[in-house]
């Protein structure tokens, strides 16, 4: 039962962090999330699939924010 609770907390933490990535609106905010992730990943054990998912989400959000910055610059 304790293992199930730990698994639940683990999954909730991953889901919460993925939500923060999804709701991030600025490159500065994304850089803070990336720095936090790089620090935290060294302190905890992540499943390979979760690590890949988080890294993909960070990269995807970076591309999205950089593309939106390019569109704003072009409109001036």
Swiss-Prot record:
Transmembrane segments: none annotated. Disulfide bonds: none annotated. It comes from Enterobacteria phage T4 (Bacteriophage T4). This is Protein UvsW.1. Keywords: Late protein. The lineage of its organism: Viruses, Duplodnaviria, Heunggongvirae, Uroviricota, Caudoviricetes. Probably interacts with UvsW. Inhibits the single-stranded annealing activity of UvsW, has no effect on UvsW helicase activity.
């Amino acid at each position: 039962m304790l293992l199930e609770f730990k698994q639940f907390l683990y999954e909730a933490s991953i889901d919460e962090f993925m939500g923060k990535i999804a709701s991030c609106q600025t490159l500065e905010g994304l850089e803070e999330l990336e720095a936090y992730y790089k620090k935290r990943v060294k302190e905890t054990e992540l499943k390979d699939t979760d690590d890949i998912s988080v890294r993909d989400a960070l990269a995807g959000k970076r591309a999205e924010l950089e593309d939106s910055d390019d569109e704003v610059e072009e409109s001036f």
